[in-house]
């Protein structure tokens, strides 16, 4: 009788433990999904980040006009529509210098393991990017789509992976949102430009940066 009671008691305890583990797993999955949602940028956030700051009218400056650096404009025209793998090391560095003071946003876009395929949890961010770049306020500008990795893995491997992933984002935007491919320049930097150099393996380093190269000084009325 006692043994039977002990067996039933043990069975009940195991059942409770199993239920607890299941609930914990479900809660963990739900929290992971919520965290992924929190990291996805909205269309509005992207639009605000990539829209050049409005500046007051000055003498000789009409609404919507801006003064572009001729050399900068020439370089932008040279790289328009280029794919990441077609860029030389010098061109990559020139792009990095060009975009320093331009409107930009870092998107935490994840990809399937060892792949350039966009993960399902990051699709909302890429779709929001597509809608933002389709907005009339941004149409006509040339954008840099730059892929970055963390410090894990070899230099050449990360360089290749970052290029393929940047090109994957461009392909998605062109095919799904009809963005003009000439308005998108893809570039990969591998592990060469860490966002958080103090923590080279940090998730923040694995990102896609989008930059509006035509930082137009749109004058406000």
Feature locations, PLM:
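Sec/Tat signal peptide C-region and signal peptidase I cleavage site
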Residues: 26-32
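Periplasmic peptidoglycan-binding/tethering modules of Gram-negative envelope proteins
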Residues: 35-142, 215-221
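A residue-level signal for beta-strand positions that form part of recognition/binding surfaces
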Residues: 29, 104, 108, 142, ...
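Periplasmic OmpA-like peptidoglycan-binding domain that tethers envelope proteins to the cell wall
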Residues: 148-221
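Accessory regions outside conserved functional cores
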Residues: 2, 19, 35-39
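Bacterial N-terminal signal peptides
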Residues: 15-26
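Bacterial N-terminal signal peptides that target proteins for export
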Residues: 2-17
